[in-house]
Amino acid sequence: MPRYTVHVRGEWLAVPCQDAQLTVGWLGREAVRRYIKNKPDNGGFTSVDDAHFLVRRCKGLGLLDNEDRLEVALENNEFVEVVIEGDAMSPDFIPSQPEGVYLYSKYREPEKYIELDGDRLTTEDLVNLGKGRYKIKLTPTAEKRVQKSREVIDSIIKEKTVVYGITTGFGKFARTVIPINKLQELQVNLVRSHSSGVGKPLSPERCRMLLALRINVLAKGYSGISLETLKQVIEMFNASCLPYVPEKGTVGASGDLAPLSHLALGLVGEGKMWSPKSGWADAKYVLEAHGLKPVILKPKEGLALINGTQMITSLGCEAVERASAIARQADIVAALTLEVLKGTTKAFDTDIHALRPHRGQIEVAFRFRSLLDSDHHPSEIAESHRFCDRVQDAYTLRCCPQVHGVVNDTIAFVKNIITTELNSATDNPMVFANRGETVSGGNFHGEYPAKALDYLAIGIHELAAISERRIERLCNPSLSELPAFLVAEGGLNSGFMIAHCTAAALVSENKALCHPSSVDSLSTSAATEDHVSMGGWAARKALRVIEHVEQVLAIELLAACQGIEFLRPLKTTTPLEKVYDLVRSVVRPWIKDRFMAPDIEAAHRLLLEQKVWEVAAPYIEKYRMEHIPESRPLSPTAFSLQFLHKKSTKIPESEDL
């Protein structure tokens, strides 16, 4: 029998429907009837006939026609809002619902599984879990570890031993012993009281990453959670039932208590929850709609769910992966700019970089060689200025391997720390099943990921800083030998004038955002937790910096492609022509001024989806795999003994000597 969950004036009502031929209007009237029956204060209605209403789907807020049949208009167990005439939409209906609601009309439940054991999760795995590409299951080894760990907790309860967080209070109340008959209440109270975050909720992708990472850490078997509870949590993840987790409120020690408490609150059926099926709604109704029951916390389990660095680390994981993606593509964008500005490839000579063998520097120089003019990929643009009088390029072109290179090495360093953190037990106390005891420690302290993510923000920012200077060179006719601001009829048209200002503004914001949050600490919990990492802000800040870097490079990409227009009919190299074609598939050339923001967003989306890398990567890898010899075209402005033998041109001597 179909059933619908209907929201009327702050109340959720389960309305069964014995006949699918009934209409949306019937559902609305029946919901209002039940509301009037169950609410003493019914808003002045004496009967259903007094209420005039509209019916909307919670999923996307689509307005329904009252005459449509339920079997056509709605799915079984769907969530519906009845909006009574004269009422504003219930303020507690959906947090930030008008902002897109995070609903996916094309969402498909994943069929593939990823096995978690607490030891092998990668940053790529977690990002894919966040995108909803996999469900989760535990390895048999992980299940055994979890069971053995729980046996230790059960023994503590049975023997009435005084152990922190299990039979005592928390923080300042660590010496307060809790009666045995209140241990479960203790855990629920912990989750409720610590759910004190503020700000916008995490997106479904980020909440999914947070939940998946907490599952992975619990799978290590050092937190004392029961296998039954952990499997319940996994079922919720696999159904994409995601609690409302505000992004602000963690100081990064003792772990990420506030956000993880909000996560746990949804799992116990309280607070708000989101799923692709329901959108935002009360957690208990979302779980019910998916055939799931709220978790009933056993002793220690509330603490097991909320104590750890998973908020910092999951956001840090996204930051690392996005930083890696934009760093790769920054090399391609810069190479295209160098072509437009008629730069030389001499600065990327293998022998130069062998003398300063930083891994990132060598790799960036290699990418430039694989993309720019060579015997393998000749460029008509490069050939057109082969014998110009320019000796060397500006630092923003010539020093890309050195500047971009250290960013690559920074990302690699941070990724190593984040990967270690992904597979670390960060609870307190730790449960050692092999020793049959619990031990209090400080693995919950977020200093490692906090420091790493501050470093990541500082490192990745430099890509935007150098990109903005290249945009200046593209737009400045005295430096580029191109029309001012890359547009015809300058004066009538302003071209990239303010796009460059946008890039400058983003770079300036980043300079403030790069101040390390982890240099700060405030004593909390009555001086019990007297040093904290501020890692949550480090992670959120790093993501903001990375987004700005992506946007600045999107502007440079558009500017470089526009510069190509003024060099036609000359062609650049094959891989860079492919990049140009990709951009032109979503953004047409500027003939005259037009609304520019959508074009910047389109280019940003190409970078965010790694499309620029996808079109250039095959050429880079072919260059690598086939060991194509390095081309070293001769130039009159670079000294070469071989060149002197081939060409008799010399600097004229003064007659006075």
Swiss-Prot record:
SUPFAM superfamilies: L-aspartase-like
UniProt GO cellular component terms: cytosol
Pfam family, one: Lyase_aromatic
Assigned keywords, A-Z: Disease variant, Histidine metabolism, Lyase, Phosphoprotein
Pathway: Amino-acid degradation; L-histidine degradation into L-glutamate; N-formimidoyl-L-glutamate from L-histidine: step 1/3
UniProt crosslink position (5-imidazolinone (Ala-Gly)): A253-G255
Domain of life of the source: Eukaryota
Gene3D superfamilies attached to this UniProt entry: Fumarase/aspartase (Central domain) (1.20.200.10), Fumarase/aspartase (N-terminal domain) (1.10.275.10), Phosphatidylinositol 3-kinase Catalytic Subunit, Chain A, domain 1 (3.10.20.90)
Record flagged with keyword NAD: no
CDD domains linked: PAL-HAL
Disease: Histidinemia: Autosomal recessive disease characterized by increased histidine and histamine as well as decreased urocanic acid in body fluids.
Protein name (record): Histidine ammonia-lyase
Gene name for this UniProt entry: HAL
